[in-house]
């Protein structure tokens, strides 16, 4: 599997792009006419040009059309993997240790991240996932994995900028999933697979069934269940500073000492794809009220879950340190995890959407008026870890919080037939919100041990207070004079005359280790609305030349407005050779999720807690 690491942070306010593409198209000779024309030339694309659909070889921009047979022929059932197999410019990787990226995989099209690609279902915009990939390029795009393969009639991939035609997300291109509209029949498949190493067992069950709604309607429903076990490609942890293999037999035998044994692995640092499972349902329905008027609706519901590991915290690292408790005794997280610990991250993703509308024609005018609602939510759980600042009172599992992306859109599209030209125009209104729900208190709370000497056992001059003297009288080994490990004279003797530093001065991290929870200070809802109007004209200038021009105006409540445009054309030199070219501009404003995303941890320079990291914009 290819893996592409996304490596930049959210750091832009506005993104503008000008694209120019040119390509020479050479078709097959007549000797292959029966096979090639049947399989390629007659593949029709809806995206790329308004008005009547065009074949992929006469489109002014490059479009790939994948049929249901193409999709079914791929061994994978995850839609991300299907597209990666069939579309060379589409890439998606597996990120074993990447916070939310473990559960919603970020993809690229034409080398640009997922939020630069507009995803459509039945030519309607698909809502974004709740995940903002803070570990990569800060992108936020739709979760294509929520679409079951059994629901697909065709997939169109426009590999060209189309922001002027379809909206600001279409910088890299457009992916349009057309759903099945069968009135009868159906399909059922069950797949099982495993890796040669004997792990990663996967089972997938998919099905589709079509029903007639009277004489003039259809209802097609598709469902998928998948379950994939984890793969393990790591080796037992062994580094010069700590080696698991060198530990005693008791360490290996004692289940409580195994950092990850509760999750079924004898390797303290698992490495590979995570455990995942999911149930997904999609429906598509339509009913013709007359020969010129049709009602339609489609939608989905999806639930999936997964879990993966973070990096191993070995005994003696910066997370596992001695602290001095209120009674003067010393405590270490090894009392919870004798062999160190590997945090385990769980994510539950819920996704649902509904689209409804009416389309028809009146004379030379066609219209399509629709409304849609989409929601995607991720709920996190963190286990097998601690909040170090809570000391011996820390729980070992946490609820760090939830992320929710919500969108509502109303859209009207029209086309008017001007004989050899088609005039398209329309408008849309989009309301979107992103919510960060705070985690449970223990996941972000700064406990007593986030500061040095929390129980005031020592004075500023490193002498013992009355409280310190009391715990010493009860048998504590407290030594306030042992306050530094510095050796300014470089004579092998520490400045305070004692080896090491007394645990009373230890300062530890704040929040659930591995993924601190969302605190109320950085939680909340981020909202905006926007509207857009566009016009598009296309047609045959001559028998050989097809041309297209589009203009779009978008206005955001938080990022102002912009006008973008595009021109494209296709020239047919001969039956075998054609030439196409396009030039366009694009504008993209950061999403509410990108503006509101937080990734904050508390650090302690000079012994005082300070929040650092990625904060909400504004």
Question: What would you call each of these model-derived segments?
Answer:
Residues 184, 197-339, 343-362, 548:
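Transmembrane beta-barrel wall of Gram-negative outer-membrane proteins
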Residues 84-128:
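Extracytoplasmic beta-strand/coil segments of soluble accessory domains associated
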Residues 343-354, 364, 373, 385-546:
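Outer-membrane beta-barrel transmembrane domain signature of Gram-negative proteins
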Residues 192-196, 203, 225-229, 301-305, ...:
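Transmembrane beta-strands of outer-membrane beta-barrel pores
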